[in-house]
């Protein structure tokens, strides 16, 4: 992992710009399991985590929720039998901010 796992999210005003493409690609090199997805013009970091059963997926979902509350930055979570889809983006700017990369990095540590 990178040093990002030791950083914390900072409040992001709606005036902040989404992360530049070159910087985002550089950051994603340390997150090979994450995919950059364009959802109706909004860039998101997305990863599907797989588990042996629903309870394991639910436990992971709760750990991500606790992390999100602690950092004040919240993902979209889809919990299904044996898998959880985590999507990070910054609603206020309609794209990806350094906070999202920090949170994706921290999410990796929860598995």
Curated annotation (Swiss-Prot):
Q: Which Pfam families match?
A: Pterin_4a
Q: Which InterPro entries match?
A: PCD_sf, Pterin-4-alpha-carb_dehyd, Pterin_deHydtase
Q: Which GO terms describe its biological process?
A: tetrahydrobiopterin biosynthetic process
Reaction catalysed by this chain? Answer: (4aS,6R)-4a-hydroxy-L-erythro-5,6,7,8-tetrahydrobiopterin = (6R)-L-erythro-6,7-dihydrobiopterin + H2O
Instruction: Name the CDD domains for this protein.
Output: PCD_DCoH_subfamily_a
Under which EC number(s) is this enzyme classified?
Answer: 4.2.1.96
Enzyme class, spelled out: lyase
- The regions listed as transmembrane in this protein's record are none
Q: Which domain of life is it from?
A: Bacteria
Q: Which GO terms describe its molecular function?
A: 4-alpha-hydroxytetrahydrobiopterin dehydratase activity
Keywords for the protein's UniProt record, in alphabetical order: Lyase
Q: HAMAP family, per this entry?
A: Pterin_4_alpha
Return the similarity comment: Belongs to the pterin-4-alpha-carbinolamine dehydratase family.
UniProt-recorded name of the protein: Putative pterin-4-alpha-carbinolamine dehydratase
